[in-house]
Amino acid sequence: MTTAIQYPSASAKARFVRVSPTKARRVIDLVRGKSVEDALDILRWAPQAASEPVAKVIASAAANAQNNEGLDPSTLVVATVFADEGPTAKRIRPRAQGRAFRIRKRTSHITVIVESRPAKKQGASASAARARRAQASKAASQKEGSE
């Protein structure tokens, strides 16, 4: 049985945000697991309207971590982020011949938990390892071709 490592964390919640939960989840999936700085950069340039409230909540969680918990902002990572469904406001749109269609104005509750994770050790990165493997396979194929 493995135990999860507990990192110091802080959270923020935005409730009753006037954006559909499915649209918020599209944006949330872009930033899950990223550092707070990277997440805010991604959201700043994301074309979706839901990126603005999500960025606000991430910035709020980072500020909570810094002010309330005393954590270093450069080590913060978006550990958990999700959008739950809030109450739906229902409106009526009149249609032809006395009919009426229902408009559903959906809301969501956006929750973000940021954790302060230690910086990774300076080791071989995945791309460097991939480059070494490619070079080794290229050398092996050239060796086979010369024989």
Curated annotation (Swiss-Prot):
Residues 112-147 are annotated as: Disordered. Keywords: Ribonucleoprotein, Ribosomal protein, RNA-binding, rRNA-binding. Residues 136-147 have a biased composition (Low complexity). InterPro entries: Ribosomal_uL22, Ribosomal_uL22_bac/chlpt-type, Ribosomal_uL22_bac/org-type, Ribosomal_uL22_CS, Ribosomal_uL22_sf. GO terms for molecular function: rRNA binding; structural constituent of ribosome. One of its GO terms (biological process) is translation. SUPFAM superfamilies: Ribosomal protein L22 (SSF54843). GO terms for cellular component: cytosolic large ribosomal subunit. This protein binds specifically to 23S rRNA; its binding is stimulated by other ribosomal proteins, e.g. L4, L17, and L20. It is important during the early stages of 50S assembly. It makes multiple contacts with different domains of the 23S rRNA in the assembled 50S subunit and ribosome. Part of the 50S ribosomal subunit. Belongs to the universal ribosomal protein uL22 family. This is Large ribosomal subunit protein uL22. The lineage of its organism: Bacteria, Bacillati, Actinomycetota, Actinomycetes, Mycobacteriales.
